[in-house]
């Protein structure tokens, strides 16, 4: 007998969001995670020189689901203890700057565009006119339209300084193939409801401390279980529950949320592939391509003294720099991010670190010699968010079986918010069906 227990396969942000939601509703939850650490593709990494993250993440003020979960597991003081909230500020020192003023939406965006530095007046006005057209269309475009096509009439300077960096950072997909509609969804969420929705929320702690650790405590304190280094190799739906195979053991659960990476899904679904819905989901997932993200950590023997904790770089090769001294109290530590498949990021990590060090000396200047570096490459950091892509919906997959993951169709690219929304959707559908 299952005794009403629920299993969640996958201890990333989607799986933990589902597990926290189920636990909060009084269900006994067991989380299975193949790795020895929770967090999935947004986790802490322990180095000889200290603790970092496998990638530098930021949240937006519009990420209500994620913020709600953080408050559930941490309490009310998520800000400023765990997240530093700043009004939208994008800057390439001496070249470009966009700052959102403290005005209601959408005036904060329109004013920010009108006052952009590094862009001529004519181009600023053209950008404002473009955003006004988007508002009239309610931020909708044909599903197969790429971001490049969407921006075809935009000034080159604005595309280069604003739209392309935002697209690459958010969708991790080049303009030429990225989904115009998903890009517009992000703009709509950030700039059309509340002024604070466009705020940047920068983590002040490592990603493990931000959510996975506290989520695990929340689950365990309420009678749940976290099983690390437990690989689930098989899933089979039965008349009275779902049988999971982990190692030599088989256990029966009342229902299961599958929240593994999309590239891991097909193995789990082998016994279910005859079901029509499962076959359709498997086909959509098999069609996904993936994009890497590379994060280089460079440590200098003294503080960086950057004007902002996050600055845009020139892409040769680093695209963004985060001052971990300002954010995490780690003076001299920089996290430099390269999204999408930049040629330099494919090579030797030591050479890449040297190239980024040279880039920072060129752009920032007044830097001492590098103390140490560590490059972390996530080869499947996100799915390629291309135009016209069909993704499976989160939630019911087969009787007693539910799907969650940042690759599911949540109107968002592969973000922390997309992951947590999918987990909550799956959990709520499960709760509604299995009282």
Residue ranges and their predicted role:
Residues 4-31:
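N-terminal Rossmann-like FAD-binding beta1-loop-alpha1 element of flavoenzymes
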Residues 80-82, 227-228, 290-293, 366-378:
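A short coil-to-beta-strand element that immediately follows conserved catalytic motifs
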Residues 23-47:
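Glycine-rich FAD pyrophosphate-binding loop
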Residues 319-435:
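Conserved flavin/dinucleotide-binding core of flavoenzymes
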Residues 186-244, 255:
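Helical element adjacent to the flavin cofactor pocket in flavoenzyme catalytic cores
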Residues 86, 233-350, 359-363, 392:
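Mid-domain catalytic core of redox enzymes
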Residues 42-61, 128-135:
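Glycine-rich active-site loop/strand segments that organize a redox cofactor
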Residues 63-72, 76-180, 184:
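Mobile amphipathic helical/loop "lid" adjacent to a hydrophobic cofactor/ligand pocket
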């Amino acid at each position: 007998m299952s005794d009403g227990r629920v299993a969640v396969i996958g201890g990333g942000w989607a799986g933990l969001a589902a597990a926290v939601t189920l636990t909060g509703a009084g269900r006994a939850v067991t989380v299975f995670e193949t790795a020895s650490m929770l967090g999935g593709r947004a986790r802490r990494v322990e180095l000889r020189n200290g603790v970092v993250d496998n990638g530098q993440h930021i949240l937006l003020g519009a990420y209500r689901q994620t913020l709600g979960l953080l408050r559930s597991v941490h309490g009310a003081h998520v800000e400023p203890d765990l997240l530093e909230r700043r009004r939208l500020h994008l800057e390439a020192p001496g070249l470009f700057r966009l700052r959102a003023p403290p005005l209601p939406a959408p005036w904060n965006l329109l004013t920010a565009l009108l006052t952009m530095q590094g862009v001529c007046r004519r181009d600023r006005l053209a950008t404002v006119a473009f955003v006004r057209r988007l508002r009239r269309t309610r931020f909708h475009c044909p599903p197969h339209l790429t971001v490049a096509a969407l921006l075809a009439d935009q000034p080159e300077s604005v595309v280069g300084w604003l739209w392309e960096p935002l697209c690459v950072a958010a969708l991790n997909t080049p303009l030429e193939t990225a989904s115009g509609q998903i890009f517009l969804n992000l703009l709509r969420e950030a700039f059309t409801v509340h002024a604070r929705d466009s705020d940047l929320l920068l983590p002040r702690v490592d990603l493990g401390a931000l959510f996975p650790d506290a989520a695990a405590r929340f689950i365990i304190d309420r009678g749940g279980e976290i099983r690390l280094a437990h690989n689930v190799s098989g899933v089979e739906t039965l008349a009275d529950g779902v049988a999971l195979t982990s190692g030599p053991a088989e256990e029966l659960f009342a229902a299961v949320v599958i929240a593994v990476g999309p590239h891991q899904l097909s193995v789990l679904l082998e016994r279910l592939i005859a079901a029509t819905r499962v076959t359709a989901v498997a086909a959509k997932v098999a069609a996904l391509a993936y994009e890497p993200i590379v994060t280089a950590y460079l440590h200098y023997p003294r503080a960086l003294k950057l004007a902002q904790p996050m600055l845009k770089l020139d892409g040769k090769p680093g695209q963004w720099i985060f001052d971990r001294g300002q954010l995490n109290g780690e003076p001299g530590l920089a996290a430099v991010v390269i999204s999408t498949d930049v040629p330099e990021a494919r090579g030797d990590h030591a050479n890449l670190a040297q190239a980024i060090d040279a880039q920072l000396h060129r752009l920032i200047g007044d830097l001492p010699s590098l103390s140490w570096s560590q490059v972390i490459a996530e080869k499947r950091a996100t799915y390629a968010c291309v135009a016209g892509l069909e993704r499976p919906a989160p939630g019911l997959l087969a009787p007693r079986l539910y799907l969650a993951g940042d690759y599911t169709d949540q109107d968002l690219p592969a973000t922390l918010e997309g992951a947590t929304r999918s987990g909550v959707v799956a959990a709520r559908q499960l709760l509604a069906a299995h009282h």
